[in-house]
């Protein structure tokens, strides 16, 4: 790989642009020496390991170790830029406490729930797993086994896991941690369009005239995309940026329309904007008449709490929270008319002139607008509604599926889209938007997987929050966790999380690269390979699927999650997991292992070892004797081809810097549902929302409803949790990078200085954050990047020494079953 004069000039320009945008680049990116003869480095491409942006990086390897990473100049997503986390990618795999051997709780040489962790062989680890899983399956059946997976699984890891549980163990009790971050987005897409994932793409950033951030701090959480917004705003003076949040953060630095609103009132604000559009005759009537229908959703749907909770008992429509009925445009207009400027301003605390400025961005026919959101919408007890309601604004004005007009749901994990959603690792889903409750979908999955009819259960399994409750209640007893840190990430962990992990009736397995809070609560820890220690694939927020090769070996005895899943499947014969009447439908499966049935089925094992690129290692292919990643991917791709989820052939992704599906005849799709851009839209129709049988999108009439818990005299503050630029999720990787750790070593409680003064508190003092569920200690911060309004505190959750989720409430959106981490009531006590 050599550097031409043109490439050198281009790379220098990239470095200069990064400096202006406030994005740090490694020295190697500014002085891009890539001649392997000089450096003795082997450079290869990969997507970044962190967020759902999907930045491309180049990875340098020497002596079987990653020694450097750079932003990939050829990557369309980031065009050579890195954020500060991407800068230090080369260090995430080399923490001093990296796990390299299986660890089992032992006492006197035997497994003991109350024993100490001791190193064991993989054979001993799987022996105990096998014993525990078979015991539970025999005593209680498939509903007592489960798995909690991840939006950080590679595509084939998630696919193999879903297959093992839903087909092998016949249990739908598998859910990803994407339930915590993207489930409301999924339900929003499915309810409005009948298909998941955005219709637009990142190209919209260069075409939009206005950007509206609904509960998204892109400057810190999606900094590379923020540089594209910044570039558009600074180079096109008429471009406007509106930032809406419950507290001030770094994204407000660019805001032309800064809006601080009271928690939960974003629902009312969106109804006001819809009312404004209608009142001012700005509805795109031709688009609305041809391409939309109207429905009214049921209300009073509860908060996803335990059935005996008073709020749940009072909910009239908790049994079917997603129900709706058809209405007319006039009905919808009357519905939103209740949300006038005076009412919404009083409710939200937002001045009326600000509401009108915001509404005009959507109403003005000459303004192309992108709406962008992340956890502010999704982690919301009405998160599915919030997603539906922002689509209302784009559909009423016809500002959708064209360059610059895009309601865009941003993702937080590198493959929350590609693995959790597209593969269907949720407890109710199958690949390509299929669901377990649909008989035709189950039949199709069983056909592709060569299963006896009736293998896949017809009821959704336990979702993430319910898994914790069922572990606590002793109804879920054999449980495997991969690539997540739910003991730190889940709400109300002391009441609903930890008790289940330490329940004597349960056996908990955690696969991870580091001894996380979750791993330390388990009974068996399995050491996992990370990132480029295995061949992988991720799918990012713009439907872009990206591949990488294995570049280095995992340390010690660490093994990939894919190897763990498939190797463990060898421990079970069909007679151990399937009833006799099911086996009778496929008598040729008698005596076979789940590995034989699921992975050595003539499809997954179709591609021989000789097809593996000889320049790269592939530990899994070597272990199993065939190109397992290719086989899994091609079998999985069968679900979506011809159904609007088309993926390119496997080998194409190793050549490309990612492709955006649907990929038809080798061509990717940038804008879905629009004629001329989407191959599934018929000529002459203009637009087709073909996920719905009638080809039309749904505009929903949905109200404002209050949160599950609000401040009162005893607990006078709102608590909001979230992330910071330097750390990713629970910090299990970033806190092991010295530079990132030093930049932000510990979480703090961000508080308004006047609130602190009124309580006699000073910056830096130790305080206790207390809720009805628990408490945690931290230091008070009244300055810095995050500035809450009075009556609200913000606490990041990356710090394993300060478990803020001891305090949070495990209320969910009843439709998406996603937790609301943004709203509960607390008090602050000086220690």
Curated annotation (Swiss-Prot):
Its EC number is 1.9.6.1. Binds 1 [4Fe-4S] cluster. Binds 1 molybdenum-bis(molybdopterin guanine dinucleotide) (Mo-bis-MGD) cofactor per subunit. Mo-bis(molybdopterin guanine dinucleotide) binds at residues 85, 152, 177, 181, 214-221, 245-249, 264-266, 375, 379, 485, 511-512, 534, 561, 721-730, 805, 822. Keywords: 4Fe-4S, Electron transport, Iron, Iron-sulfur, Metal-binding, Molybdenum, Nitrate assimilation, Oxidoreductase, Periplasm, Signal, Transport. It catalyses: 2 Fe(II)-[cytochrome] + nitrate + 2 H(+) = 2 Fe(III)-[cytochrome] + nitrite + H2O. Its cofactor is [4Fe-4S] cluster; Mo-bis(molybdopterin guanine dinucleotide). Component of the periplasmic nitrate reductase NapAB complex composed of NapA and NapB. This is Periplasmic nitrate reductase. The lineage of its organism: Bacteria, Pseudomonadati, Pseudomonadota, Betaproteobacteria, Burkholderiales. The gene is napA.
């Amino acid at each position: 790989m050599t550097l031409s004069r043109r490439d050198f000039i281009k790379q220098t320009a990239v470095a200069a642009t990064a400096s202006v945008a406030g994005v740090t680049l490694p020295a190697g990116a500014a002085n891009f020496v890539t001649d392997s003869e000089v450096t003795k480095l082997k450079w290869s491409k990969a997507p970044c390991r962190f967020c759902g942006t999907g930045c491309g990086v180049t990875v340098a390897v020497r002596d079987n170790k990653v020694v450097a990473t750079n932003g990939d100049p050829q990557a369309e997503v980031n065009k050579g830029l890195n954020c500060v986390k991407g800068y230090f990618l080369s260090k995430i795999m080399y923490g001093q406490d990296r796990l390299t051997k299986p660890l089992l709780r032992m006492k006197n040489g035997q497994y003991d729930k109350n024993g100490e962790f001791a190193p064991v062989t993989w054979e001993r680890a799987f022996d105990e797993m096998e014993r525990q899983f078979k015991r539970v399956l025999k005593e209680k059946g498939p509903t007592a086994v489960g798995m909690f997976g991840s939006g950080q699984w590679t595509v084939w890891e998630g696919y193999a896991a879903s297959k093992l549980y839903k087909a092998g163990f016949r249990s739908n009790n598998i859910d990803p941690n994407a339930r915590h971050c993207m489930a409301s987005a999924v339900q929003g897409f499915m309810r409005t369009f009948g298909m998941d994932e955005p219709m637009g793409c990142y190209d919209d950033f260069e075409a939009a005239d206005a950007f509206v951030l609904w509960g998204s701090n892109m400057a810190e959480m999606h900094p590379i995309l923020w540089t594209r917004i910044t570039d558009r705003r600074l180079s096109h003076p008429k471009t406007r940026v509106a930032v809406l949040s419950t507290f001030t953060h770094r994204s407000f630095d660019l805001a032309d329309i800064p809006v601080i609103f009271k928690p939960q009132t974003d629902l009312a604000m969106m109804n006001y904007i819809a009312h404004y559009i209608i009142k001012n005759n700005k509805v795109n009537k031709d688009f609305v008449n041809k391409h939309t229908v109207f429905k009214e959703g049921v209300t009073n749907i509860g908060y996803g709490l335990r059935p005996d909770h008073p709020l749940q008992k009072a909910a009239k429509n908790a049994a079917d929270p997603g129900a709706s009925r058809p209405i007319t445009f006039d009905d919808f207009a009357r519905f939103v008319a209740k949300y006038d400027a005076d009412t919404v301003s009083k409710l939200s605390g937002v001045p009326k002139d600000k509401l009108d400025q915001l509404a005009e961005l959507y109403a003005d026919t000459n303004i192309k607008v992108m709406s962008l959101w992340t956890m502010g919408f999704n982690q919301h007890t009405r998160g599915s509604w919030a997603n539906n309601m922002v689509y209302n604004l784009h559909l009423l004005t016809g500002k959708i599926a064209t360059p610059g007009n895009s309601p865009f749901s941003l993702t937080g994990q590198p493959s929350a889209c590609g693995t959790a959603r597209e593969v269907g690792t949720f407890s109710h889903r199958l690949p390509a938007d299929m669901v377990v409750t649909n008989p035709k979908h189950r039949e199709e999955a069983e056909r592709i997987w060569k299963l006896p009819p009736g293998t896949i259960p017809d009821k959704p399994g336990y979702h993430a929050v319910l898994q914790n409750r069922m572990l606590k209640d002793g109804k879920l007893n054999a449980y495997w966790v991969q690539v997540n840190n739910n003991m730190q990430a889940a709400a109300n962990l002391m009441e609903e999380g930890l008790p289940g992990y330490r329940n004597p009736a349960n056996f908990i397995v955690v696969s991870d690269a580091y001894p996380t809070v979750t791993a330390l609560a388990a009974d068996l820890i399995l050491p996992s390979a990370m990132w480029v220690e295995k061949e992988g694939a991720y799918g990012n927020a713009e439907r872009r699927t990206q591949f990488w090769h294995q570049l280095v070996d995992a340390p010690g005895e660490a093994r990939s999650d894919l190897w763990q899943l498939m190797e463990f499947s060898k421990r079970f014969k069909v007679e151990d997991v399937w009833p006799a009447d099911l086996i009778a439908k496929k008598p040729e499966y008698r005596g076979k292992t789940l590995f034989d049935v699921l992975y050595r089925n003539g499809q997954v094992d179709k591609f021989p070892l000789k097809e593996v690129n000889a320049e790269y290692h592939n530990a899994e292919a070597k272990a199993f004797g065939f190109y397992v990643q290719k086989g899994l991917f091609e079998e999985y791709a069968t679900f979506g081809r011809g159904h609007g989820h088309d993926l390119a052939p496997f080998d194409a992704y190793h050549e490309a810097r990612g492709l955006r599906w649907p990929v038809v005849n080798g061509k990717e799709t940038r804008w879905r549902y629009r004629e001329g851009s989407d191959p599934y839209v018929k000529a002459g129709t203009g637009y087709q929302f073909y996920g719905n049988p009638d080809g039309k999108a749904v505009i929903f009439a949905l109200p404002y409803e209050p949160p599950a818990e609000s401040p009162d005299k005893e607990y006078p503050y709102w608590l909001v949790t979230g992330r910071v630029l330097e750390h990713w999720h629970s910090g299990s990787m970033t806190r092991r990078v010295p530079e990132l750790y030093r930049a932000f070593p510990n979480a703090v409680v961000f508080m308004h200085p006047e609130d602190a003064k009124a309580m006699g508190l000073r910056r830096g003092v130790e305080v206790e954050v207390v809720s009805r569920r628990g408490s945690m200690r931290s230091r008070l911060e009244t300055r810095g990047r995050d500035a809450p309004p009075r009556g609200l505190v913000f606490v990041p959750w990356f710090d394993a020494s300060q478990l803020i989720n001891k305090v949070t409430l495990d209320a969910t959106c009843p439709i998406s079953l996603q937790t609301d981490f943004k709203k509960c009531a607390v008090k602050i006590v000086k220690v």
